[in-house]
Amino acid sequence: QLMDLGFLNRDLERARGIDYNLTFRDTIDIGVPVDLQISIAANRNLERSLTFTNPDGTVDYESYEGEWGFSEWRAQSGVVLAWDKWRFNWQTRYLGAVTQDEDAIDAFSDAFTASDTCLGPPTDELCRDYAEAGSYMIHSVSISYEEDNWYLGMGVRNLEDKSPPLADPSEITGVKSRAIGYGYDLMGRNF
């Protein structure tokens, strides 16, 4: 018997968006000359999709924009102030809101049927497997002093100690109800 499986082809994977990059540099005078640099890098996700043709010819189209890992907006910005041997740095990271794949949203139910997040009544919206997150922003700051042969620096990453969003790990990639692998800070504030 002849086996003819052919080559598995994803057909078309598409990523389309707009990148925005802005850098501003100047020296400002506040009694002493201070070098100022402001930079912003942002990305707007317009399309992230996959078109797949099964061996029987059935075409399956999946759109990912706005879902986990493919938020509509991502951005990073920084402000640097430098004077003499001192340097101050403030960075911000932003991830836009995300939602679960519409096809994977479970019907409302209790923990004894399809939901594994609580024991409420079947119509309780808090019992649905949860896989949505609002926008997320963290700030980090540092200050440093540099001499010819030594350097001293200190900083705080995730200044506000912002946790990643809660989500059901049976719906998205996560551990202990925390989304992992999507750009969220998992370490919390550290110095």
Residue ranges and their predicted role:
Residues 46, 93-109, 144-191:
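C-terminal beta-signal and adjacent terminal beta-strands/loops
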Residues 126-132, 139-141:
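Short, glycine/charged-rich beta-strand-loop motifs at protein surfaces that mediate ligand recognition
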Residues 1-3, 50-64, 100-129, 166-183:
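Solvent-exposed loop segments that connect transmembrane elements
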Residues 20-22, 79, 90, 139-143, ...:
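Hydrophobic, well-ordered secondary-structure elements that form the walls
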Residues 14-18, 71-75, 135-139, 148, ...:
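Residues that define the transmembrane beta-barrel architecture of outer-membrane proteins
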Residues 8-12, 66, 130-133, 182-184:
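Outer-membrane beta-barrel proteins
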Residues 1-104:
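Gram-negative outer-membrane beta-barrel transporters
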Residues 42-44, 83-86, 139-141, 150-155:
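A generic structural signal for ordered secondary structure
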